[in-house]
Amino acid sequence: ENAKAHGVTQKEIAAVITHIAFYAGWPKGWAAFNLAKDVWSIDEGDLSYEDEAMRAHTKKMIFPIGEPNDKFAQYFTGKSFLAPVSTSQVGIFNVTFEPGCRNNWHIHHAKSGGGQILICIAGRGYYQEEGKEAVEMKPGDCVNIPAEVKHWHGAAPDEWFSHLAIEVPGEKTSSEWCEIVTDEIYGKLK
Protein backbone atom coordinates (compact mmCIF):
# COMPACT_ATOMS: atom_id res chain seq x y z
CA GLU A 1 0.00 0.00 0.00
CA ASN A 2 2.92 2.31 0.72
CA ALA A 3 4.27 1.92 -2.83
CA LYS A 4 0.85 2.68 -4.32
CA ALA A 5 0.48 5.71 -2.05
CA HIS A 6 3.79 7.01 -3.42
CA GLY A 7 2.73 6.71 -7.05
CA VAL A 8 3.86 3.22 -8.10
CA THR A 9 1.43 2.09 -10.80
CA GLN A 10 -0.04 -1.38 -11.28
CA LYS A 11 2.12 -1.89 -14.38
CA GLU A 12 5.27 -0.81 -12.53
CA ILE A 13 4.69 -3.09 -9.52
CA ALA A 14 4.00 -6.03 -11.86
CA ALA A 15 7.35 -5.45 -13.59
CA VAL A 16 9.20 -5.09 -10.27
CA ILE A 17 7.75 -8.30 -8.83
CA THR A 18 8.46 -10.20 -12.07
CA HIS A 19 12.13 -9.20 -11.97
CA ILE A 20 12.45 -9.96 -8.26
CA ALA A 21 10.85 -13.40 -8.74
CA PHE A 22 13.79 -14.45 -10.90
CA TYR A 23 16.10 -13.85 -7.93
CA ALA A 24 13.91 -14.72 -4.94
CA GLY A 25 12.11 -17.62 -6.62
CA TRP A 26 8.68 -17.98 -8.18
CA PRO A 27 6.89 -19.19 -5.00
CA LYS A 28 7.84 -15.95 -3.22
CA GLY A 29 7.14 -13.93 -6.34
CA TRP A 30 3.72 -15.55 -6.71
CA ALA A 31 2.88 -14.68 -3.09
CA ALA A 32 3.84 -11.06 -3.77
CA PHE A 33 1.70 -11.02 -6.93
CA ASN A 34 -1.33 -12.10 -4.92
CA LEU A 35 -0.75 -9.36 -2.34
CA ALA A 36 -0.19 -6.72 -5.01
CA LYS A 37 -3.31 -7.86 -6.86
CA ASP A 38 -5.38 -6.91 -3.82
CA VAL A 39 -3.66 -3.54 -3.32
CA TRP A 40 -3.79 -2.58 -7.00
CA SER A 41 -7.26 -3.98 -7.63
CA ILE A 42 -8.95 -2.73 -10.76
CA ASP A 43 -12.04 -0.66 -10.16
CA GLU A 44 -15.09 -1.42 -12.30
CA GLY A 45 -14.86 2.05 -13.84
CA ASP A 46 -11.27 1.42 -14.96
CA LEU A 47 -12.25 -1.46 -17.21
CA SER A 48 -13.04 -0.67 -20.80
CA TYR A 49 -13.83 -4.27 -21.72
CA GLU A 50 -17.39 -4.85 -22.87
CA ASP A 51 -17.41 -8.59 -22.17
CA GLU A 52 -18.40 -9.32 -18.55
CA ALA A 53 -16.37 -12.57 -18.46
CA MET A 54 -13.30 -10.70 -19.70
CA ARG A 55 -13.85 -8.03 -17.04
CA ALA A 56 -14.09 -10.72 -14.34
CA HIS A 57 -10.91 -12.41 -15.65
CA THR A 58 -9.02 -9.10 -15.54
CA LYS A 59 -9.80 -8.72 -11.84
CA LYS A 60 -8.00 -12.01 -11.12
CA MET A 61 -4.56 -10.75 -12.17
CA ILE A 62 -2.22 -7.85 -11.66
CA PHE A 63 -0.98 -7.68 -15.25
CA PRO A 64 -2.95 -5.82 -17.90
CA ILE A 65 -4.58 -7.87 -20.65
CA GLY A 66 -2.98 -5.58 -23.19
CA GLU A 67 -3.98 -4.93 -26.76
CA PRO A 68 -5.53 -7.29 -29.31
CA ASN A 69 -2.71 -9.52 -30.57
CA ASP A 70 -3.13 -8.43 -34.20
CA LYS A 71 0.52 -9.00 -35.16
CA PHE A 72 0.22 -12.73 -34.46
CA ALA A 73 -3.53 -13.18 -35.10
CA GLN A 74 -2.84 -15.39 -38.13
CA TYR A 75 -1.27 -17.96 -35.79
CA PHE A 76 -4.24 -18.15 -33.41
CA THR A 77 -7.68 -19.74 -33.51
CA GLY A 78 -9.82 -17.21 -31.63
CA LYS A 79 -8.89 -13.86 -30.14
CA SER A 80 -5.82 -13.22 -28.00
CA PHE A 81 -4.30 -10.18 -26.31
CA LEU A 82 -0.66 -9.24 -25.70
CA ALA A 83 0.89 -7.07 -22.96
CA PRO A 84 4.68 -6.70 -22.83
CA VAL A 85 5.98 -6.97 -19.26
CA SER A 86 9.71 -6.79 -20.05
CA THR A 87 11.46 -6.37 -23.38
CA SER A 88 15.04 -5.95 -22.16
CA GLN A 89 17.37 -8.76 -21.05
CA VAL A 90 14.62 -11.39 -21.05
CA GLY A 91 11.39 -11.01 -23.02
CA ILE A 92 8.33 -11.49 -20.80
CA PHE A 93 4.82 -11.08 -22.17
CA ASN A 94 1.36 -11.55 -20.70
CA VAL A 95 -0.67 -13.43 -23.30
CA THR A 96 -4.42 -13.65 -22.70
CA PHE A 97 -6.70 -16.05 -24.59
CA GLU A 98 -10.49 -15.83 -24.81
CA PRO A 99 -12.33 -19.12 -24.12
CA GLY A 100 -11.52 -21.64 -26.86
CA CYS A 101 -8.60 -19.62 -28.23
CA ARG A 102 -5.32 -21.40 -28.87
CA ASN A 103 -2.22 -20.78 -30.89
CA ASN A 104 -0.99 -22.96 -33.74
CA TRP A 105 1.52 -25.71 -33.25
CA HIS A 106 4.92 -24.04 -33.18
CA ILE A 107 8.59 -24.62 -32.45
CA HIS A 108 11.12 -22.33 -30.76
CA HIS A 109 14.40 -23.02 -32.53
CA ALA A 110 17.85 -22.27 -31.11
CA LYS A 111 21.41 -23.28 -31.87
CA SER A 112 21.94 -23.40 -28.09
CA GLY A 113 19.78 -22.41 -25.12
CA GLY A 114 16.44 -20.96 -26.12
CA GLY A 115 12.97 -22.31 -25.56
CA GLN A 116 10.13 -20.81 -23.55
CA ILE A 117 8.70 -20.79 -20.04
CA LEU A 118 4.95 -20.40 -19.46
CA ILE A 119 3.51 -19.40 -16.08
CA CYS A 120 -0.27 -19.36 -15.73
CA ILE A 121 -1.37 -16.20 -13.93
CA ALA A 122 -5.16 -16.40 -14.28
CA GLY A 123 -7.88 -18.65 -15.63
CA ARG A 124 -7.43 -22.14 -17.00
CA GLY A 125 -5.68 -23.36 -20.11
CA TYR A 126 -3.64 -26.12 -21.68
CA TYR A 127 -0.17 -26.86 -22.98
CA GLN A 128 0.54 -29.81 -25.25
CA GLU A 129 3.71 -31.21 -26.78
CA GLU A 130 3.40 -33.15 -30.00
CA GLY A 131 2.85 -36.84 -29.28
CA LYS A 132 1.90 -36.27 -25.62
CA GLU A 133 -1.30 -35.64 -23.67
CA ALA A 134 -2.31 -32.03 -23.02
CA VAL A 135 -1.42 -30.64 -19.59
CA GLU A 136 -3.94 -28.44 -17.78
CA MET A 137 -2.57 -25.13 -16.50
CA LYS A 138 -4.01 -23.24 -13.53
CA PRO A 139 -2.68 -20.12 -11.73
CA GLY A 140 0.85 -20.72 -10.49
CA ASP A 141 1.54 -23.66 -12.84
CA CYS A 142 4.79 -23.43 -14.78
CA VAL A 143 5.83 -25.26 -17.95
CA ASN A 144 9.41 -25.29 -19.22
CA ILE A 145 9.58 -25.83 -22.98
CA PRO A 146 12.99 -26.76 -24.37
CA ALA A 147 14.03 -25.49 -27.78
CA GLU A 148 13.02 -27.68 -30.75
CA VAL A 149 9.84 -29.04 -29.08
CA LYS A 150 6.70 -28.72 -31.21
CA HIS A 151 3.81 -27.57 -29.01
CA TRP A 152 0.76 -25.35 -28.59
CA HIS A 153 -0.98 -23.59 -25.69
CA GLY A 154 -4.32 -21.91 -25.18
CA ALA A 155 -7.47 -21.44 -23.15
CA ALA A 156 -9.91 -24.06 -21.95
CA PRO A 157 -13.10 -24.15 -24.04
CA ASP A 158 -15.12 -22.40 -21.34
CA GLU A 159 -12.66 -20.12 -19.55
CA TRP A 160 -10.34 -17.17 -20.15
CA PHE A 161 -6.62 -17.93 -19.72
CA SER A 162 -3.56 -15.73 -19.16
CA HIS A 163 0.06 -16.78 -18.95
CA LEU A 164 3.41 -15.11 -18.81
CA ALA A 165 5.46 -16.20 -21.81
CA ILE A 166 9.15 -15.93 -21.00
CA GLU A 167 11.66 -16.11 -23.83
CA VAL A 168 14.64 -18.18 -22.71
CA PRO A 169 17.81 -16.53 -24.04
CA GLY A 170 19.72 -18.53 -26.60
CA GLU A 171 21.91 -18.37 -29.66
CA LYS A 172 20.33 -17.95 -33.10
CA THR A 173 16.74 -18.19 -31.82
CA SER A 174 13.65 -18.12 -34.02
CA SER A 175 10.06 -19.35 -33.97
CA GLU A 176 8.46 -21.54 -36.61
CA TRP A 177 4.67 -21.42 -36.83
CA CYS A 178 3.09 -24.63 -38.04
CA GLU A 179 -0.44 -25.95 -38.65
CA ILE A 180 -3.51 -25.05 -36.61
CA VAL A 181 -4.60 -27.16 -33.66
CA THR A 182 -7.62 -28.89 -35.15
CA ASP A 183 -11.01 -28.99 -33.47
CA GLU A 184 -10.54 -32.77 -33.24
CA ILE A 185 -7.33 -32.42 -31.19
CA TYR A 186 -8.71 -29.54 -29.13
CA GLY A 187 -11.96 -31.43 -28.52
CA LYS A 188 -10.04 -34.18 -26.69
CA LEU A 189 -9.15 -31.86 -23.79
CA LYS A 190 -10.36 -33.09 -20.41
Predicted regions mapped to residue ranges:
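Conserved short histidine dyad/triad with adjacent acidic residue
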Residues: 93-112
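A short hydrophobic beta-strand segment most commonly corresponding to one strand
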Residues: 158-177
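Hydrophobic alpha-helical segments
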Residues: 1-56, 132, 138, 190
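Conserved metal-binding segment of the jelly-roll/cupin
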Residues: 97-100, 137-158
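A short, N-terminal "cap"/entry segment at the start of jelly-roll beta-barrel domains
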Residues: 54-93, 104, 174-190
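Short hydrophobic/aromatic-rich beta-strand segments that constitute the beta-sheet cores
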Residues: 82-83, 127, 163
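A short beta-strand-loop-beta hairpin characteristic of the jelly-roll/cupin
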Residues: 102, 112-139, 149
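Short, charged/polar surface micro-motifs in flexible loops or helix N-caps
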Residues: 88-90, 98-102, 124, 171
